[in-house]
């Protein structure tokens, strides 16, 4: 990732819900400024209150958790659904969505 892309990602509040714990750990290494809320329905709804983008990885997440995340996100936030665990593809999808 270029420095310009990194600064670009750093300028947004991006939250991630879903995916396996192993995937979230790996994603946190690649995207250290993103906020990871886990895959359980019991996350704090207020955590998403300031989100610019909410990524929902539909692998290893319940339908109830997905719906809670969608409903908790501000109306101004973009919801990005993915079922792909490839972090490079996730980065590309984010850049396409944001630009």
What are these regions, as identified by a protein language model?
Residues 74-99:
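Ser/Thr/Gly-rich flexible loops in soluble cytosolic domains mediating phosphotransfer, phosphorylation
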Residues 62-64:
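Short glycine-rich, flexible loops that bind phosphorylated cofactors or substrates
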Residues 39-46, 70, 79-81:
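An anionic, turn-rich surface loop/hairpin at beta-sheet edges
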Residues 49-50:
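Alpha-helix C-terminal capping/helix-to-coil transition sites in glycosyltransferase folds
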Residues 58:
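Glycine-rich, N-terminal phosphate-binding loop of Rossmann-like dinucleotide-binding domains
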Residues 27-31, 66-73:
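Short, aromatic/basic amphipathic alpha-helical patches
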Residues 2-43:
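Redox- and metal-dependent alpha/beta enzyme cores, enriched for Fe-S-associated oxidoreductases
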